[in-house]
Regions:
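Hydrophobic/aromatic beta-strand elements that line small-molecule binding cavities or substrate pockets
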Residues: 76-81, 95-96, 108-114
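A short hydrophobic beta-strand element
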Residues: 85-94
Length: 138
């Protein structure tokens, strides 16, 4: 496959993951990650429930569980995809409600996905951490 073809496939894979997340298809999501995948939340653990670094498929499951228990997205826009080699950067916007408090939140985000052999090996989240912390504050 050409470099451009591989980059297009990587973007398609990222879009499939977001679709599976919207449908809460945990098994589909888990199948897309390598066994030794690493996920980096937007803040240290303790600052946000899904903060910190998560290792392996069990860590991936913990990350998505904490995220799903904390936030109820009402709008989730994927605005742009930037790709080079095995990385896909997603620029987006999200707003919704913090489940524990019922407070609204909104944030722009940047997600960086690294792919190897058709599987995600690394995921990094960047967003407005202060806005999310405020929405979760009791």
């Amino acid at each position: 496959m050409t470099r451009v073809g591989q980059e297009e496939e990587n973007v398609s894979m990222v879009k499939r993951l977001y679709d599976a997340f919207k449908r809460r298809e945990v098994h589909s999501i888990m199948d897309m990650f390598e066994d030794n995948a690493v996920m980096h939340g937007p803040a240290p653990l303790g600052v946000l429930p899904w903060g910190g670094t998560y290792n392996g498929r069990s860590g991936v499951a913990q990350f998505f569980k904490a995220l799903g228990e904390s936030l109820e997205p009402q709008q989730f826009d994927l605005n742009d995809f930037i790709t080079q080699d095995n990385k896909v950067v997603v620029l987006g916007y999200q707003k919704g409600r913090a489940k524990p408090t019922g407070r609204p939140y909104e944030t722009e985000f940047v997600n960086v996905w690294t792919i190897r052999n058709g599987k995600f090996i690394e995921f990094r989240v960047y967003n407005d951490t202060a806005a999310l912390v405020e929405s979760l504050r009791p």
